Structure formats: C-alpha cells, structure tokens
A protein has these predicted regions:
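Substrate-binding cleft of carbohydrate-active enzyme catalytic domains
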Residues: 1-131
Length: 131
C-alpha cells in the first residue's frame, strides 16, 4: 500500500504479480475478489499503526501473526482515512466489482465496550430523538 508503507512486510505480492494472478484467473473464468478483514483480524495494521486501535489496547503487544482479538477503533477518523487509502488502491488493482471486508470474529465485548472513544460514539448514536 503505497500511502502506508509500514503495512507491507517482507513477504508480499507485488502489484505486477497480482496483475498476473488476476489475468491467469480470468483466463479460466475465475474472478479474484480481494479481502480486507475489518474491524477484526487487524493485528498487522495495529502493529504498524498502533494509534488506530482502541484506547485500552495501547499497552498490549501487537505481533504480526499472533491472534490477540484486537480491533480497529470505530471512533477514530484516522482509521477511516487509512482504509479509504487501502480500498482506493486495492480497487484500482482488481477488476472485480466486489471487495470482501470480513466483519467476522469481531469481538466487540473485548474491544469497543472497553474503549473510551467507542463508548462515546455508542452513547451519541443511541441517544433518543425527540418525539
């Protein structure tokens, strides 16, 4: 991801390699659909950019490849900016009309219910509207 180079580790497909894979698949009538797991399964992005995590996770070690069930903070504008950049770049690479965003195994009770920023957003979103 060009705008966020810390997201790229030592083992990755180049954009040229992805183009070859997509072309190979298309020749066999297979559509390659990219997947970006959010808001869970995000240890790699949190290891690179820990400020995108919930407030209570600041002191938790984030090592790529480990499952620690941490999530991106839902009330952090920087999360949305980074993911817009990622989605824009991925969309340009893949001809598919679809991007799979995951959404599974997001353990809210261990993350958003303990995060001060997320709690603030939840309270604002659940305020009763006047009759």
């Amino acid at each position: 991801i060009k705008k966020h180079p810390k997201l790229v580790g030592k083992d990755y497909y180049t954009q040229e390699q992805l183009a070859e894979i997509i072309q190979y698949a298309a020749q066999r009538n297979i559509e390659v659909i990219p997947e970006l797991d959010i808001p869970g399964h995000t240890v790699a992005i949190l290891a690179a950019y820990p400020e995108l995590g919930c407030t209570h996770t600041d002191t938790i070690a984030k090592n790529v490849g480990e499952t620690v069930n941490l999530m991106l903070c839902a009330n952090n504008e920087k999360v949305y900016e980074v993911y817009k950049d990622i989605i824009d770049e991925v969309s340009a690479l893949f001809p598919s009309r679809y991007i799979h965003l995951g959404g599974d195994e997001a353990i809210i009770e261990k993350n958003w219910t303990k995060c001060e920023r997320c709690q603030k957003m939840m309270k604002e979103l659940t305020k009763r509207l006047p009759n």
